[in-house]
């Protein structure tokens, strides 16, 4: 279990790099994006041809207008992830931005941690997102924290196709 967390840019990018590496070795890869609701990203356009890819978010924000809807959306995404985590044919599962759903209580942490603990022994999982909960960090084999040293967005540079999405 690898956790890529922190306030810096590149958490999802690091996970998708691992997905590309696994695919290059002929491994079956599954990706569940829990927050993002875009389906026009470069990573999905390319990796989605080779991996099972699910964009399950509805773009909700932390200042939600409908918590019940956000929880239902999270649970739909988790159902897909749980299926992958129970299937030994998946050698790598990327759970992109899962940390937010745990931190905000959109998913039951005990259920998620149990699924991660009892997944097939040869299955690798990458979890991304800011503020990884302590229990997830404790369970992980590897935790990387990406720092926000400087970001072009603060200088007014918008996300660019091929670089940021």
Model-derived regions, located:
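Conserved P-loop
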Residues: 1-86
